Every structure is written in C-alpha cells, then in structure tokens.
Amino acid sequence: KSISFHVDKYYLAVGEKAKLNYSAIVVGEGHLNWSSEKEDIVSVSEGEIEGKSLGTSKVSLSDGTGKKAEVLVIVTDLLEKPVLNDKKKFLPCKAFTEEEALVFDEALETRIKNKGEGSRAALIETIRFLTLSFPYKISYFYENGRLTQNNVRNKADGEGRYYHKGLFLSENKFKDLVATHKGPAIWGCPLTNLEDHGKYKPGSKYPNGLDCSGFVTWALYNAGIDVGDIGAGIDPNVKDMSDIGEMHTLTYDYANSDDYHVGDLIARWGHTALIAGKDDQYLYIAESLLKGVRIEKVSYKNKNSGLYKYYAYINKLDEEYIANDDYLEMW
C-alpha cells in the first residue's frame, strides 16, 4: 500500500473545515486511519480537518503496517473563516509584511494543489479564497493597460490586473512585472488612474486592485487555467472572456436548469464574473465592480431579480477544466 497527500502543508482559519485529498494504493483489504498530533489545534474526521485554535499540528493517514503520509496543518489568524461578509474593509496600503504575504501565497497554492490544478474545484477554491478567506476587500481599479494589448491598450502589468501567481501584496513582486505604465503599486497602494467615470478622475490616485476581467483572469490563471490576460468582451475581432467556453443566453429557464455549474462564467457586455456558489434559491456571483472584489447574492427563482436585468449570458467552462467535477459544496 502506498499513501500520499496532494500537499505537504495546509493553512486553515480557526473554525474553518477542509477536506484533505490523497492517493492510496491498497493491496487486499485494509483500513486507513486518520490522526492529528494536536487535536486541540486541528481535529480530523475521515479526512475532514477543522482548525480549533491557533498553532500547528501534523495530520497523518496510516494503514496500520507502518506506511503513512503526513500534512502539516497551520491554523493562522491571517485567514478568516469563509462566510459571506460584505462589511469587510478595503485593503489598505502595505497591510502585510513580506512574511505574511508569503503565507497568503502558500495558503492559496496549497489549496489549489489539494483540489488539483486545472480543475473546476481549484478555480472555486481560488475564487472563495480572495472573496471569503482573505480578510480585506480588494479595491476596483480601472486597468491602465494589460499584457494583451490588442493595439488599443497600453502595455501594463499589475495596474488593475495581475496575471501572475499569488496575491499582489509585496513590493518584492515588482521584479516579476513585465511592463509598467503608471505603476508599480501593490494592491491597496495609490496608483494613478486614467479613467473618467463617476468618482474616478484622470490623473488622480486610487488604491490599486482589479477590474472585472482582471479578477476573473487572475482567478483562472491561479487555478491553473491559462486563458491569457484578456478583457471581458464582447468584441468580434478580439479574443476576450466571452469567447471562453460555451455561451448560453441567460433566460429564466436556463438559470433554473441544471446545464451550468458553479465555476462557470456569468457576464453581460463589458463585464465578466464567476459563479462562486449556488443553492436552491440564489446564485453567488464573484465579481469586481465599484464595490470591490466581492460576492453578490442574487435570486434566480424570482423572475424580477436583478440577475435578469444585469447579466446576459453564462459561459460553460466544461472544456476548459482538466477535471470537471460538479461542485455542490458551499462554504
């Protein structure tokens, strides 16, 4: 028998639960035993771990013959138990140390690897990490340009977009930027804006963050799905998010069907978002708009719902995923 976890480290918030995925080759009959070195810090039951208090504990899976695998589980106060909380404050400038920024990156990376890079579950994990587990809201920022220029954009990297792995929380990441226009500035720090819309005035500085497609492409890329640093759409002459997957018009009947899933795109012209959850009444839409990167709870059962006023289509991403599991779990 051979046992191995998908990760050797995993981060949790106090009160948060997660399922550790593993591979086991069993010869004949055998029973696998779970244990936690410190049950007061991390409890475990049939592969589901729960953060009980701050600290670390090794979680083990053994077969009784001496073969076992271990994961170091770290319960940290940097992460929040994932609940829908629209009262989060916006991320301030330089909120975290370099060491703390690395923890966020490692926490996200190990969650993705635990689910399997390129899978639907990995994308959902990524969406929920930034909108629920991360303790602040990322600000909306109109992009100053992108890596995919399409001859109409400035070439800019990390200005309202971030097509790189991890969170943009440390100035050590400036060295990874391919091009700058008005930056660089990490998320939450002031950056010169070029857009003239509402409170946004050209030449004024606002906290750097993500625009709508900046958030969606960041989430896809971090989950292991490389669609490129592209915009929302719809433009018949340019590759954009509306070209990814299989497009379906968002009607009441379609929204109430079983044809689409959590982890699919939901959008309207010029705006793109991701479905972060679904229950028997509501869709939970993860998006970046003027309120920041957050989850909007909207009814699909009510025919007069804002869902049908503000969104126009759903793009099924079945073909984009390496593993296309139907993700029914909420947070």
What are these regions (language model features)?
Residues 1-82:
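Extracytoplasmic soluble-region selector
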Residues 225-296:
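...with weaker cross-activation on analogous glycine-rich loops/strands in unrelated enzymes
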Residues 72-74, 297-301:
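Short amphipathic beta-strand/extended segments with alternating polar/hydrophobic composition
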Residues 82-213, 217-223:
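N-terminal capping segments
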Residues 300-331:
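Low-complexity, Gly/Ser/Thr/Pro-rich intrinsically disordered linker/tail segments
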Residues 32, 41-42, 238-255, 305-308, ...:
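Short glycine-aromatic motifs
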Residues 76-78, 276-278, 312-319:
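Short beta-strand-to-coil "C-cap" segments at the C-terminal boundary of structured domains/repeats
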